[in-house]
Swiss-Prot record:
Disulfide bonds: none annotated. Pfam families: UDPGT. The lineage of its organism: Eukaryota, Viridiplantae, Streptophyta, Embryophyta, Tracheophyta. It comes from Arabidopsis thaliana. This is UDP-glycosyltransferase 76E5. UDP-alpha-D-glucose binds at residues 272, 324-326, 341-349, 363-366.
Protein backbone atom coordinates (compact mmCIF):
# COMPACT_ATOMS: atom_id res chain seq x y z
CA UNK A 1 0.00 0.00 0.00
CA UNK A 2 1.37 3.46 -0.93
CA UNK A 3 2.11 5.99 1.77
CA UNK A 4 -0.23 8.89 2.37
CA UNK A 5 0.49 11.67 -0.16
CA UNK A 6 0.24 14.35 2.55
CA UNK A 7 3.28 15.85 4.21
CA UNK A 8 5.36 13.40 6.22
CA UNK A 9 5.37 14.17 9.93
CA UNK A 10 8.40 14.58 12.20
CA UNK A 11 7.90 14.47 15.99
CA UNK A 12 10.46 16.55 17.92
CA UNK A 13 11.19 15.82 21.59
CA UNK A 14 13.33 18.61 23.11
CA UNK A 15 14.89 18.57 26.58
CA UNK A 16 12.96 21.23 28.57
CA UNK A 17 15.65 23.91 28.95
CA UNK A 18 16.11 27.01 26.78
CA UNK A 19 19.51 25.97 25.41
CA UNK A 20 18.02 22.69 24.15
CA UNK A 21 14.59 23.89 22.99
CA UNK A 22 15.94 26.71 20.79
CA UNK A 23 18.10 24.57 18.45
CA UNK A 24 15.40 21.87 18.32
CA UNK A 25 12.88 24.46 17.11
CA UNK A 26 15.43 25.68 14.56
CA UNK A 27 15.87 22.10 13.34
CA UNK A 28 12.09 21.76 13.09
CA UNK A 29 11.85 24.89 10.98
CA UNK A 30 14.64 23.68 8.66
CA UNK A 31 12.84 20.35 8.14
CA UNK A 32 9.48 22.08 7.71
CA UNK A 33 10.97 24.11 4.85
CA UNK A 34 12.02 20.79 3.29
CA UNK A 35 8.43 19.54 3.22
CA UNK A 36 7.87 17.81 6.58
CA UNK A 37 5.01 18.51 8.97
CA UNK A 38 6.31 19.19 12.47
CA UNK A 39 4.86 18.12 15.81
CA UNK A 40 6.64 19.26 18.98
CA UNK A 41 6.14 17.30 22.21
CA UNK A 42 6.66 19.52 25.27
CA UNK A 43 5.97 19.31 28.99
CA UNK A 44 3.40 21.54 30.69
CA UNK A 45 6.10 24.00 31.83
CA UNK A 46 7.24 24.63 28.25
CA UNK A 47 3.96 25.16 26.47
CA UNK A 48 4.58 27.65 23.68
CA UNK A 49 2.74 30.92 24.07
CA UNK A 50 4.06 32.49 20.84
CA UNK A 51 2.92 29.87 18.33
CA UNK A 52 2.68 32.56 15.63
CA UNK A 53 6.44 32.13 15.16
CA UNK A 54 5.80 28.55 14.01
CA UNK A 55 2.83 28.53 11.61
CA UNK A 56 1.86 25.00 10.70
CA UNK A 57 3.61 23.41 13.69
CA UNK A 58 1.52 21.23 15.97
CA UNK A 59 2.30 21.32 19.70
CA UNK A 60 1.31 18.46 21.98
CA UNK A 61 1.73 18.27 25.73
CA UNK A 62 3.37 15.36 27.51
CA UNK A 63 1.98 15.27 31.08
CA UNK A 64 4.91 16.14 33.32
CA UNK A 65 6.10 13.47 35.72
CA UNK A 66 8.59 15.87 37.29
CA UNK A 67 8.15 19.66 37.21
CA UNK A 68 10.84 21.73 35.52
CA UNK A 69 11.18 23.69 38.77
CA UNK A 70 12.92 20.60 40.21
CA UNK A 71 15.84 21.01 37.79
CA UNK A 72 17.88 23.29 40.04
CA UNK A 73 16.94 21.49 43.26
CA UNK A 74 17.95 18.05 41.95
CA UNK A 75 20.85 19.08 39.73
CA UNK A 76 21.02 18.29 36.03
CA UNK A 77 22.09 14.62 36.36
CA UNK A 78 19.35 13.56 38.81
CA UNK A 79 16.77 15.58 36.90
CA UNK A 80 17.68 13.79 33.65
CA UNK A 81 17.61 10.36 35.31
CA UNK A 82 14.21 10.99 36.96
CA UNK A 83 12.69 12.51 33.83
CA UNK A 84 13.68 9.49 31.74
CA UNK A 85 12.52 6.94 34.31
CA UNK A 86 9.07 8.46 34.64
CA UNK A 87 8.16 9.83 31.19
CA UNK A 88 8.07 6.77 28.94
CA UNK A 89 4.43 5.74 29.51
CA UNK A 90 2.90 9.20 29.03
CA UNK A 91 5.05 9.78 25.93
CA UNK A 92 4.00 6.46 24.40
CA UNK A 93 0.33 7.32 24.98
CA UNK A 94 0.92 10.70 23.32
CA UNK A 95 2.53 9.17 20.20
CA UNK A 96 -0.10 6.41 19.94
CA UNK A 97 -2.78 9.12 19.94
CA UNK A 98 -0.92 11.02 17.20
CA UNK A 99 -0.76 7.88 15.05
CA UNK A 100 -4.53 7.47 15.34
CA UNK A 101 -5.12 11.16 14.73
CA UNK A 102 -2.89 11.47 11.65
CA UNK A 103 -3.22 8.06 10.03
CA UNK A 104 0.23 6.61 10.71
CA UNK A 105 2.03 9.46 8.91
CA UNK A 106 4.95 9.81 11.37
CA UNK A 107 8.20 9.53 9.41
CA UNK A 108 10.52 9.83 12.40
CA UNK A 109 10.88 10.80 16.06
CA UNK A 110 13.85 13.13 16.58
CA UNK A 111 14.73 13.35 20.25
CA UNK A 112 17.25 15.30 22.30
CA UNK A 113 20.03 13.00 23.45
CA UNK A 114 18.97 13.66 27.07
CA UNK A 115 15.41 12.45 26.32
CA UNK A 116 16.55 8.90 25.58
CA UNK A 117 13.30 7.36 26.89
CA UNK A 118 11.82 8.39 23.51
CA UNK A 119 13.66 5.59 21.69
CA UNK A 120 11.69 2.82 23.45
CA UNK A 121 8.40 4.29 22.23
CA UNK A 122 9.75 4.63 18.68
CA UNK A 123 10.91 1.01 18.75
CA UNK A 124 7.62 -0.34 20.18
CA UNK A 125 5.55 1.59 17.63
CA UNK A 126 7.95 0.76 14.76
CA UNK A 127 8.81 4.38 14.03
CA UNK A 128 12.37 5.35 12.98
CA UNK A 129 14.21 7.47 15.56
CA UNK A 130 17.09 9.93 15.27
CA UNK A 131 19.15 11.54 18.05
CA UNK A 132 19.78 15.30 18.14
CA UNK A 133 22.73 16.54 20.15
CA UNK A 134 22.49 20.26 20.89
CA UNK A 135 26.07 20.53 22.15
CA UNK A 136 29.30 20.41 20.18
CA UNK A 137 30.61 17.35 18.36
CA UNK A 138 33.61 17.45 20.70
CA UNK A 139 31.33 17.25 23.71
CA UNK A 140 29.65 14.18 22.22
CA UNK A 141 33.08 12.63 21.66
CA UNK A 142 33.86 13.28 25.33
CA UNK A 143 30.62 11.55 26.36
CA UNK A 144 31.70 8.51 24.32
CA UNK A 145 35.08 8.46 26.06
CA UNK A 146 33.65 9.06 29.54
CA UNK A 147 31.03 6.33 29.11
CA UNK A 148 33.82 3.74 28.99
CA UNK A 149 35.61 4.91 32.14
CA UNK A 150 35.46 3.55 35.66
CA UNK A 151 34.67 6.48 37.96
CA UNK A 152 36.81 5.37 40.89
CA UNK A 153 39.86 4.59 38.73
CA UNK A 154 39.48 7.83 36.76
CA UNK A 155 39.45 9.93 39.95
CA UNK A 156 42.65 8.23 41.13
CA UNK A 157 44.36 8.53 37.74
CA UNK A 158 43.49 12.21 37.46
CA UNK A 159 45.51 13.01 40.58
CA UNK A 160 48.59 12.44 38.41
CA UNK A 161 49.54 15.65 36.49
CA UNK A 162 51.04 13.51 33.73
CA UNK A 163 47.68 11.80 33.15
CA UNK A 164 45.84 15.13 33.30
CA UNK A 165 47.98 16.51 30.48
CA UNK A 166 47.83 13.43 28.24
CA UNK A 167 46.26 14.20 24.85
CA UNK A 168 43.24 12.04 24.04
CA UNK A 169 44.22 9.76 21.15
CA UNK A 170 43.47 11.25 17.70
CA UNK A 171 41.86 14.32 19.28
CA UNK A 172 44.66 16.87 19.69
CA UNK A 173 44.61 19.29 21.52
CA UNK A 174 41.96 17.68 23.81
CA UNK A 175 43.57 16.48 27.05
CA UNK A 176 42.12 14.23 29.73
CA UNK A 177 41.87 17.19 32.12
CA UNK A 178 39.57 18.87 29.57
CA UNK A 179 36.96 16.09 29.69
CA UNK A 180 33.76 17.84 30.86
CA UNK A 181 33.11 16.36 34.31
CA UNK A 182 33.16 19.38 36.65
CA UNK A 183 29.94 20.86 37.97
CA UNK A 184 27.94 17.74 37.08
CA UNK A 185 27.55 16.17 40.53
CA UNK A 186 28.92 12.74 41.60
CA UNK A 187 31.17 11.40 38.84
CA UNK A 188 29.79 7.86 38.89
CA UNK A 189 26.24 9.11 38.31
CA UNK A 190 27.41 11.45 35.54
CA UNK A 191 29.22 8.61 33.76
CA UNK A 192 25.97 6.63 33.85
CA UNK A 193 24.26 9.48 32.00
CA UNK A 194 27.11 9.56 29.46
CA UNK A 195 26.57 5.84 28.86
CA UNK A 196 22.84 6.43 28.27
CA UNK A 197 23.52 9.35 25.92
CA UNK A 198 26.00 7.47 23.73
CA UNK A 199 23.93 4.26 23.66
CA UNK A 200 22.28 4.66 20.27
CA UNK A 201 19.98 1.64 20.80
CA UNK A 202 17.83 1.45 17.65
CA UNK A 203 18.31 5.11 16.62
CA UNK A 204 19.23 5.30 12.95
CA UNK A 205 21.27 8.54 12.84
CA UNK A 206 22.73 11.42 14.87
CA UNK A 207 22.19 15.11 14.07
CA UNK A 208 24.65 17.66 15.51
CA UNK A 209 24.31 21.45 15.52
CA UNK A 210 27.85 22.10 14.31
CA UNK A 211 29.90 22.51 11.15
CA UNK A 212 32.87 20.61 9.75
CA UNK A 213 34.79 23.90 9.44
CA UNK A 214 34.75 24.17 13.26
CA UNK A 215 35.06 20.56 14.39
CA UNK A 216 36.44 18.44 11.57
CA UNK A 217 38.57 16.13 13.75
CA UNK A 218 35.76 15.44 16.26
CA UNK A 219 33.28 14.78 13.46
CA UNK A 220 35.73 12.41 11.77
CA UNK A 221 36.17 10.60 15.10
CA UNK A 222 32.40 10.21 15.53
CA UNK A 223 31.84 9.02 11.97
CA UNK A 224 34.46 6.31 12.51
CA UNK A 225 33.34 5.37 16.04
CA UNK A 226 29.56 5.30 15.55
CA UNK A 227 27.83 2.69 13.43
CA UNK A 228 25.15 5.11 12.18
CA UNK A 229 25.25 8.25 9.99
CA UNK A 230 26.25 11.60 11.53
CA UNK A 231 24.75 14.79 10.10
CA UNK A 232 26.45 18.11 11.08
CA UNK A 233 23.81 20.70 10.08
CA UNK A 234 24.90 23.79 11.98
CA UNK A 235 24.81 26.53 12.76
CA UNK A 236 21.05 26.03 12.59
CA UNK A 237 20.23 29.56 13.72
CA UNK A 238 21.55 31.02 10.42
CA UNK A 239 19.40 28.76 8.27
CA UNK A 240 16.12 29.55 10.04
CA UNK A 241 14.31 32.40 11.78
CA UNK A 242 12.98 30.32 14.68
CA UNK A 243 12.85 32.47 17.79
CA UNK A 244 11.55 30.65 20.84
CA UNK A 245 12.35 32.09 24.27
CA UNK A 246 11.10 30.88 27.63
CA UNK A 247 11.99 34.33 28.99
CA UNK A 248 10.61 37.65 27.76
CA UNK A 249 13.19 39.60 25.77
CA UNK A 250 13.77 43.29 26.56
CA UNK A 251 14.27 45.11 23.26
CA UNK A 252 15.00 48.50 24.85
CA UNK A 253 18.69 47.58 24.82
CA UNK A 254 18.77 47.88 21.00
CA UNK A 255 17.86 51.55 21.31
CA UNK A 256 20.69 51.97 23.85
CA UNK A 257 23.16 50.20 21.52
CA UNK A 258 22.20 52.56 18.69
CA UNK A 259 23.76 55.42 20.69
CA UNK A 260 27.13 53.70 21.25
CA UNK A 261 30.33 53.88 19.18
CA UNK A 262 31.37 51.20 16.68
CA UNK A 263 32.64 47.97 18.35
CA UNK A 264 32.89 49.71 21.75
CA UNK A 265 30.36 47.70 23.80
CA UNK A 266 31.04 44.55 25.81
CA UNK A 267 27.89 42.41 25.95
CA UNK A 268 27.58 40.23 29.08
CA UNK A 269 25.23 37.24 29.30
CA UNK A 270 25.83 34.03 31.22
CA UNK A 271 22.89 32.01 29.95
CA UNK A 272 19.51 31.07 31.32
CA UNK A 273 20.48 28.85 34.29
CA UNK A 274 23.81 30.10 35.62
CA UNK A 275 23.79 31.95 38.95
CA UNK A 276 26.34 34.48 40.18
CA UNK A 277 27.33 35.42 43.71
CA UNK A 278 26.79 39.04 44.82
CA UNK A 279 30.55 39.53 45.38
CA UNK A 280 31.27 38.35 41.83
CA UNK A 281 28.65 40.73 40.43
CA UNK A 282 30.24 43.64 42.31
CA UNK A 283 33.78 42.81 41.14
CA UNK A 284 32.51 42.48 37.57
CA UNK A 285 30.74 45.84 37.79
CA UNK A 286 33.86 47.65 38.99
CA UNK A 287 36.07 45.92 36.44
CA UNK A 288 33.70 46.87 33.64
CA UNK A 289 33.49 50.46 34.91
CA UNK A 290 37.28 50.78 35.18
CA UNK A 291 37.74 49.53 31.61
CA UNK A 292 36.11 52.76 30.37
CA UNK A 293 34.03 50.76 27.87
CA UNK A 294 30.22 50.85 27.69
CA UNK A 295 28.57 47.54 28.56
CA UNK A 296 25.23 45.79 28.08
CA UNK A 297 24.61 43.32 30.90
CA UNK A 298 21.93 40.63 31.10
CA UNK A 299 21.07 39.90 34.73
CA UNK A 300 18.17 37.49 34.62
CA UNK A 301 15.15 37.42 36.98
CA UNK A 302 16.02 35.84 40.32
CA UNK A 303 19.57 37.20 40.41
CA UNK A 304 18.87 40.90 40.63
CA UNK A 305 19.41 41.37 44.37
CA UNK A 306 22.42 43.58 43.63
CA UNK A 307 24.16 46.02 45.92
CA UNK A 308 23.08 49.65 45.39
CA UNK A 309 26.71 50.28 44.43
CA UNK A 310 26.27 48.21 41.27
CA UNK A 311 23.22 50.18 40.17
CA UNK A 312 25.19 53.44 40.50
CA UNK A 313 28.09 52.04 38.47
CA UNK A 314 25.81 50.78 35.73
CA UNK A 315 23.84 54.02 35.47
CA UNK A 316 27.03 55.86 34.45
CA UNK A 317 28.37 53.53 31.78
CA UNK A 318 26.13 50.54 31.24
CA UNK A 319 22.70 49.14 30.54
CA UNK A 320 21.08 46.22 32.40
CA UNK A 321 18.25 44.07 31.03
CA UNK A 322 16.65 40.87 32.34
CA UNK A 323 16.86 39.10 28.98
CA UNK A 324 18.12 40.29 25.59
CA UNK A 325 17.39 39.37 21.96
CA UNK A 326 20.87 37.88 21.70
CA UNK A 327 21.15 37.42 17.93
CA UNK A 328 20.16 41.05 17.35
CA UNK A 329 22.63 42.22 19.98
CA UNK A 330 25.56 40.25 18.54
CA UNK A 331 24.92 41.49 15.00
CA UNK A 332 24.79 45.12 16.17
CA UNK A 333 27.81 47.17 14.96
CA UNK A 334 28.30 48.71 18.42
CA UNK A 335 29.13 45.33 20.00
CA UNK A 336 32.86 44.64 20.16
CA UNK A 337 32.96 41.64 22.49
CA UNK A 338 30.82 39.05 24.27
CA UNK A 339 31.33 37.97 27.90
CA UNK A 340 29.81 34.50 27.81
CA UNK A 341 29.35 31.35 29.87
CA UNK A 342 30.25 29.55 26.61
CA UNK A 343 27.16 27.44 26.19
CA UNK A 344 27.24 25.95 22.69
CA UNK A 345 24.39 28.08 21.30
CA UNK A 346 26.05 31.29 22.49
CA UNK A 347 29.42 30.14 21.16
CA UNK A 348 27.99 29.53 17.69
CA UNK A 349 25.99 32.78 17.71
CA UNK A 350 29.07 34.81 18.64
CA UNK A 351 31.39 33.22 16.07
CA UNK A 352 28.76 33.52 13.33
CA UNK A 353 28.74 37.30 13.89
CA UNK A 354 32.54 37.55 14.11
CA UNK A 355 32.43 38.72 17.75
CA UNK A 356 35.37 37.70 20.01
CA UNK A 357 34.64 36.46 23.53
CA UNK A 358 35.57 36.70 27.18
CA UNK A 359 34.99 33.17 28.45
CA UNK A 360 33.66 32.61 31.96
CA UNK A 361 32.38 29.00 31.93
CA UNK A 362 30.58 27.41 34.89
CA UNK A 363 30.45 23.67 34.16
CA UNK A 364 32.34 20.99 32.27
CA UNK A 365 30.82 21.35 28.79
CA UNK A 366 31.14 25.13 28.92
CA UNK A 367 34.79 24.79 30.01
CA UNK A 368 35.39 22.50 27.04
CA UNK A 369 33.91 25.09 24.67
CA UNK A 370 35.96 27.85 26.32
CA UNK A 371 39.16 25.87 25.81
CA UNK A 372 38.40 25.60 22.09
CA UNK A 373 37.48 29.30 21.87
CA UNK A 374 40.79 30.38 23.43
CA UNK A 375 43.27 27.71 22.30
CA UNK A 376 41.95 26.18 19.06
CA UNK A 377 39.96 28.89 17.26
CA UNK A 378 41.82 31.67 19.15
CA UNK A 379 38.85 34.03 19.21
CA UNK A 380 38.57 34.64 22.95
CA UNK A 381 40.10 35.13 26.39
CA UNK A 382 39.51 32.64 29.23
CA UNK A 383 38.92 34.02 32.75
CA UNK A 384 39.86 31.47 35.41
CA UNK A 385 39.73 31.51 39.20
CA UNK A 386 37.94 34.14 41.25
CA UNK A 387 36.54 37.14 39.44
CA UNK A 388 38.53 40.22 40.48
CA UNK A 389 37.99 43.74 39.15
CA UNK A 390 41.56 44.08 37.88
CA UNK A 391 41.40 40.92 35.78
CA UNK A 392 37.98 41.95 34.42
CA UNK A 393 39.34 45.34 33.36
CA UNK A 394 42.37 43.73 31.67
CA UNK A 395 40.24 41.16 29.85
CA UNK A 396 37.90 43.84 28.46
CA UNK A 397 40.83 45.97 27.27
CA UNK A 398 42.53 42.94 25.67
CA UNK A 399 39.36 42.27 23.72
CA UNK A 400 38.17 45.78 22.81
CA UNK A 401 41.25 48.04 22.86
CA UNK A 402 44.51 46.09 22.41
CA UNK A 403 46.07 44.69 19.23
CA UNK A 404 45.46 41.20 20.62
CA UNK A 405 41.73 41.83 20.32
CA UNK A 406 42.16 42.94 16.70
CA UNK A 407 43.73 39.55 15.92
CA UNK A 408 40.90 37.71 17.65
CA UNK A 409 38.33 39.70 15.70
CA UNK A 410 40.10 38.97 12.40
CA UNK A 411 40.12 35.23 13.14
CA UNK A 412 36.47 35.38 14.22
CA UNK A 413 35.56 37.09 10.93
CA UNK A 414 37.34 34.34 8.96
CA UNK A 415 35.31 31.71 10.86
CA UNK A 416 32.16 33.78 10.30
CA UNK A 417 32.64 33.57 6.54
CA UNK A 418 33.38 29.83 6.67
CA UNK A 419 30.27 29.13 8.75
CA UNK A 420 28.05 31.21 6.50
CA UNK A 421 29.50 29.44 3.46
CA UNK A 422 28.77 26.05 5.05
CA UNK A 423 25.00 26.70 5.08
CA UNK A 424 24.83 28.13 1.55
CA UNK A 425 24.11 25.95 -1.48
CA UNK A 426 26.98 23.49 -1.92
CA UNK A 427 28.31 24.04 1.62
CA UNK A 428 28.96 21.14 3.99
CA UNK A 429 26.02 21.84 6.33
CA UNK A 430 23.68 22.57 3.40
CA UNK A 431 24.61 19.23 1.85
CA UNK A 432 24.26 17.42 5.20
CA UNK A 433 20.69 18.74 5.56
CA UNK A 434 19.82 17.49 2.07
CA UNK A 435 21.35 14.10 2.89
CA UNK A 436 19.32 13.93 6.11
CA UNK A 437 16.09 14.74 4.25
CA UNK A 438 16.74 11.98 1.70
CA UNK A 439 17.57 9.60 4.55
CA UNK A 440 14.34 10.41 6.43
CA UNK A 441 12.27 10.02 3.27
CA UNK A 442 13.85 6.62 2.61
CA UNK A 443 13.24 5.53 6.23
CA UNK A 444 9.59 6.60 5.90
CA UNK A 445 9.09 4.62 2.70
CA UNK A 446 10.56 1.53 4.35
CA UNK A 447 8.31 1.58 7.44
Amino acid sequence: MEKNAEKKRIVLVPFPLQGHITPMMQLGQALNLKGFSITVALGDSNRVSSTQHFPGFQFVTIPETIPLSQHEALGVVEFVVTLNKTSETSFKDCIAHLLLQHGNDIACIIYDELMYFSEATAKDLRIPSVIFTTGSATNHVCSCILSKLNAEKFLIDMKDPEVQNMVVENLHPLKYKDLPTSGMGPLERFLEICAEVVNKRTASAVIINTSSCLESSSLSWLKQELSIPVYPLGPLHITTSANFSLLEEDRSCIEWLNKQKLRSVIYISVGSIAHMETKEVLEMAWGLYNSNQPFLWVIRPGTESMPVEVSKIVSERGCIVKWAPQNEVLVHPAVGGFWSHCGWNSTLESIVEGVPMICRPFNGEQKLNAMYIESVWRVGVLLQGEVERGCVERAVKRLIVDDEGVGMRERALVLKEKLNASVRSGGSSYNALDELVHYLEAEYRNT
